[in-house]
Curated annotation (Swiss-Prot):
Keywords: ATP-binding, Cytoplasm, DNA damage, DNA recombination, DNA repair, DNA-binding, Hydrolase, Nucleotide-binding. Homohexamer. Forms an RuvA(8)-RuvB(12)-Holliday junction (HJ) complex. HJ DNA is sandwiched between 2 RuvA tetramers; dsDNA enters through RuvA and exits via RuvB. An RuvB hexamer assembles on each DNA strand where it exits the tetramer. Each RuvB hexamer is contacted by two RuvA subunits (via domain III) on 2 adjacent RuvB subunits; this complex drives branch migration. In the full resolvosome a probable DNA-RuvA(4)-RuvB(12)-RuvC(2) complex forms which resolves the HJ. Residues 185-255 are annotated as: Small ATPAse domain (RuvB-S). It is found in: Cytoplasm. One of its GO terms (biological process) is DNA repair. The RuvA-RuvB-RuvC complex processes Holliday junction (HJ) DNA during genetic recombination and DNA repair, while the RuvA-RuvB complex plays an important role in the rescue of blocked DNA replication forks via replication fork reversal (RFR). RuvA specifically binds to HJ cruciform DNA, conferring on it an open structure. The RuvB hexamer acts as an ATP-dependent pump, pulling dsDNA into and through the RuvAB complex. RuvB forms 2 homohexamers on either side of HJ DNA bound by 1 or 2 RuvA tetramers; 4 subunits per hexamer contact DNA at a time. Residues 258-334 are annotated as: Head domain (RuvB-H). Belongs to the RuvB family. Disulfide bonds: none annotated. Residues 4-184 are annotated as: Large ATPase domain (RuvB-L). This is Holliday junction branch migration complex subunit RuvB. GO terms for molecular function: ATP binding; ATP hydrolysis activity; four-way junction DNA binding; four-way junction helicase activity.
Amino acid sequence: MIEADRLISADAVPEEEFLDRAMRPKLLKEYVGQPQVREQMEIFIQAARKRGDALDHLLIFGPPGLGKTTLANIVANEMGVNMRTTSGPVLEKAGDLAALLTNLEPHDVLFIDEIHRLSPVVEEVLYPAMEDYQLDIMIGEGPAARSIKLDLPPFTLIGATTRAGSLTSPLRDRFGIVQRLEFYNVADLQYIVGRSAQCLGLDLTQEGSLEVARRARGTPRIANRLLRRVRDFSEVKSEGAITGTVATQALDMLAVDTEGFDYMDRKLLLAIIDKFMGGPVGLDNLAAAIGEERETIEDVLEPFLIQQGFIQRTPRGRMATQHAYRHFGLTREE
């Protein structure tokens, strides 16, 4: 319910979009992290260009803020084509999708964010477009209605989602390339923070960039947001370079701890530890205990905590690990 208000939320914020676009890499050679994805996409793109074909349809999934839109833009740039952007909830009617598809040039990219939220009627129109580059359109109404087929130019559909499991099998099976984005390591994030600091004209030391990177929850979008807040702190509270000390003071003031946890993460972990004796606890009980929706816990709070080894999923529910106890200076009673 309050995810949008969190400083370390990985969700996009409209007022940040302009700055984020300016800091995004444009080509694969500028793309940092995700080495397996980068290597595979380089081969797929080169092969498609060598054949003179459109790139196969691409599904990109993973937690928010890891660069799905950035990768889609890079693909379009590397292929030398235009990209049209929309999102699942926006495409309410079949005609909305048809209008986009009929305006594509050969090999263009159509990027659909939140593709798991497509309506069934729109999805049905998408199937023949993806498979046969054809569009089935109904003309007229009632008994006089008839279907006509329109040929489409070869194009690449790039779908992005945080919930790949919510895609229907027929849609998922039509993607020739599927890429999962993982959380970034600290070294890659530090490089990204340094590059963003250059774009913003900041004097950021190695220690300063490291402090921002290690608290950014493995997520470039969060790293860039924290960097901007550290910049604000530095402009008011200090002079000169943003050092490790300045970054630490700023992030401590913002209540983002050394693991990148904010009060919601700490609330979740302490609920498991204090209210449920470390677990296991069912998701519904945990959601009620902290006043959040189960989807928020599952999609927003848990992934990073599980990846970092602070929560363990078991058949009987969630458990706090020894890492979680140590983070709060506690000892688990056996």
